[in-house]
Amino acid sequence: MNKNLLFSYLAGTVLGMAAVLPGAAQHTAQAPAEAVGDAARITVRLDRISERTVSDRLLGFNIVYAKNPDSLWRSGVLEKAIRDVRPGFLRYPGGTVNTYFHWEHPTGNGWEDLWDPQYDTARNRPPEEFMDIDEYMALVRRTGAEPLLGINVNSGFRWNRVEEGVQEALRLMKYCRDKGFKVKYWFMGNEPYMHDCNGGAVTPARYGEMINAFVPRMKEFDPDIKIIANWHATFRKHGRQYDELFAVAGRNIDIIDVHWYCMWGTASWNEWLAKTPCGVFLGDSYASEID
C-alpha cells in the first residue's frame, strides 16, 4: 500500500498546545579560525526566542471502523506506516460515525443507527469485515499510540433512551477495565454542529446537556478519565459558541480538540509533505488554530 492510500484512510486531529516565550538572547556562530580567521566570526542577536512546548498527543488519526475493513490491515503495510508517523492518538470508531455507533452490536453501516425503529438488521455486514474494540486495542498496543474511544451521546437523546445510552457507555468502560485496556481519554459525540450527525445539528447548549447526562456517571466509575469535547471542527472562529458550551458543561469537559484535515477528500501524501502548514480546509491552517 502506498502512502497516498494511507493518507486517504487516516485523518489528522490537532488537540492542544502551550507556548513559552523566554527573554532575548544572543548566539554566536564561529567558523574554524585556522580556515578563515577572525573575520569569519558572525554574531546574531535575537530580540526574542519563541519556543513552544507541545503535547505529545498533538497529532492523531481516525480509525473509521465502517470504512477500514480488516482486509486493509492484513499486509501490515498500513500498520507500519502508522508506527512510522508515530501519532499521539488513534481515535475509534471515527468521527460522525461515533454518533451512530453501538459498540456491542456494530453493524458495519457507519451512518445508520441500530436504535432507529426503521433499521433493517438484514443489512448488517459480517463482523469480520470491520475492526471491533479488541482489534482496535491490539492495534493501539502494537503502534504505541494512545487510545481515544468515542461515546455515542446522540442515540439516547434522539430516540428518548438516554439512560440506556449512559448504561451502554458504562458497559464499555467496564469492558475495557476487565480486559486490561487502559483508556484514559474519551470523546463525546463528534462535531454536532454538522447536519449529518445522528439526529441532525445541535446547538452548543444542547451538546452541553448531552455531555452533562453522561460524564458525571462516567467519572463516578473512573475519576481519572479525561473527557474530550468538540462542538465544531475549529475553535478560534467559534469562541462565542464554545462559551455557550462551557456555560452549560464546562465543569464536565477536560479537553477541547480541534480537527484539521488537509485538502479534505483530495489530498495526497506528497501534497501534505509539500505544504506546511497545510491550510486549505475551513480557511486557515492548523498552525493559526493553535497559535
Model regions and ranges:
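Glycoside hydrolase catalytic-domain groove-lining segments
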Residues: 126-129, 263-291
